[in-house]
């Protein structure tokens, strides 16, 4: 999907780029697969802010996505490619032979009318989902489960792909987009191919208002706050931080590694991601 530029008729138009939505085939979602989505503005169930800089934005409907891909042996035909406001990738509506409809994350190269399949017997073809033990090494994959049957958790955003490197014992070595090499149980499922909407990384938001449409609020620097609000705050006029950079809660920031060394999944990481 290519990006579209505009003539600089105003400062807000000058750098904006948008997707041309060439792959999208319909504008309305499948009603049976849509749910209401209530805005949280970064708050948890206690009403406390757990994610800063969230709030407002355009109203959205949630599209129920099939991340488990557990409809084994039933062929499905791609009916539409659709825009999803809740993720960077596009989604595809699949009509299965038994009459059921499901949304999946649309891989790059998936076309309307194409047939896809799930299960150990599926072919190594873009859009098909198989356990890692049935996928040959070297193949690009996405939508990977961390635990068998729990649904895809990693490599789901636009343009993302991982590579199955090798199989050893009960685990597969997978190189993730970050460069990290991690072990996944061989019974975990993955989808063949790269996530679609590859040009998403080239999109420039271009103006503050467009960020607000997406529900992103401004990020205020700690150094311009008062001491009561941030460890970097205070001082007369423009003053340096005066200490190693920290988060608003006093934890080391800007490059300091914060992963817990005792985390159980650390033993599954063969090689850490590159900086």
UniProtKB/Swiss-Prot annotation:
This is Large ribosomal subunit protein uL2. SUPFAM superfamilies: Nucleic acid-binding proteins, Translation proteins SH3-like domain. The lineage of its organism: Bacteria, Bacillati, Bacillota, Clostridia, Thermoanaerobacterales. The gene is rplB. PROSITE patterns: RIBOSOMAL_L2. It comes from the Bacteria. GO terms for molecular function: rRNA binding; structural constituent of ribosome; transferase activity. Pfam families: Ribosomal_L2, Ribosomal_L2_C. One of the primary rRNA binding proteins. Required for association of the 30S and 50S subunits to form the 70S ribosome, for tRNA binding and peptide bond formation. It has been suggested to have peptidyltransferase activity; this is somewhat controversial. Makes several contacts with the 16S rRNA in the 70S ribosome. One of its GO terms (biological process) is cytoplasmic translation.
């Amino acid at each position: 999907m290519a990006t579209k530029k505009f003539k600089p008729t105003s400062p807000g138009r000058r750098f904006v780029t948008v997707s041309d939505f060439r792959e999208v085939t319909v504008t309305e979602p499948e009603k049976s697969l849509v749910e209401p989505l209530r805005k949280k503005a970064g708050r948890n169930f206690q009403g406390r802010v757990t994610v800063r800089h969230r709030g407002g934005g355009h109203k959205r409907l949630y599209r129920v996505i099939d991340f488990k891909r557990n409809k084994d042996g039933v062929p499905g035909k791609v009916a539409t490619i659709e825009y999803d406001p809740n993720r960077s990738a596009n989604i595809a509506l699949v009509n299965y032979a038994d009459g059921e409809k499901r949304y999946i994350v649309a891989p790059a190269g998936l076309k309307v009318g194409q047939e896809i399949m799930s299960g150990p017997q599926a072919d190594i073809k873009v859009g098909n989902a198989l356990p890692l033990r049935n996928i040959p090494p070297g193949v690009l994959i996405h939508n990977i489960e961390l635990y068998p049957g729990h649904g895809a958790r990693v490599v789901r955003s636009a343009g993302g792909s991982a590579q199955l490197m090798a199989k050893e014992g009960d685990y597969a070595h997978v190189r993730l987009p970050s460069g990290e090499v991690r072990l996944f149980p061989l019974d975990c499922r993955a989808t063949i191919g790269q996530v679609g909407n590859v040009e998403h990384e080239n999109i420039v938001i271009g103006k503050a208002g467009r960020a607000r449409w997406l529900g992103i609020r401004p990020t205020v620097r700690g150094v311009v706050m008062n001491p009561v609000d941030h460890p970097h705050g205070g001082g007369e006029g423009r003053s340096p931080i005066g200490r190693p950079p920290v988060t608003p809660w006093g934890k080391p920031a800007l490059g300091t590694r914060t992963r817990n060394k005792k985390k159980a999944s650390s033993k599954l990481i063969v090689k850490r991601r590159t900086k």
